[in-house]
């Protein structure tokens, strides 16, 4: 059984009324990035579900602390 992991995800979207792509960082806990899709969509409602993942990584350490 896979344990849930902490993901740091860079989201991109071009919300209505914007001329250039915007970005935001999303943190979520799940078994995969795909599992976090509903939370990512809810996190950025102005994008109306039209978001994409530019980058992500699993957070395993913060400072001297293991995650």
Q: What function would you assign to each model-found segment?
A:
Residues 1-22:
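Short aromatic-glycine-(Arg/Gly/Cys) micro-motifs in beta-strand/loop hairpins
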Residues 44-67:
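Short, mixed-charge low-complexity intrinsically disordered segments
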Residues 11, 25, 41-43:
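A structural feature that tracks compact, well-ordered secondary-structure segments
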Residues 32-48:
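A short, charged, amphipathic alpha-helix used as a generic interaction element across diverse proteins
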Residues 8-10, 33-35, 66:
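Domain-level signal for compact, non-enzymatic binding modules
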Residues 21-31:
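A short, exposed loop/beta-hairpin motif centered on an aromatic-Gly-Thr core
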Residues 14-16, 33, 61:
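Generic structural motif
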């Amino acid at each position: 059984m896979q344990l849930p992991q902490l993901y740091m995800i860079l989201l991109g979207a071009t919300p209505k009324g914007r001329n250039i792509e915007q970005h935001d960082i999303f943190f979520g806990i799940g078994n995969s990035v795909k599992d976090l899709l509903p939370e990512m969509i809810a996190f950025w409602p102005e994008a109306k579900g039209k978001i994409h993942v530019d980058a992500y990584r699993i957070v395993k350490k913060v400072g001297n602390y293991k995650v």
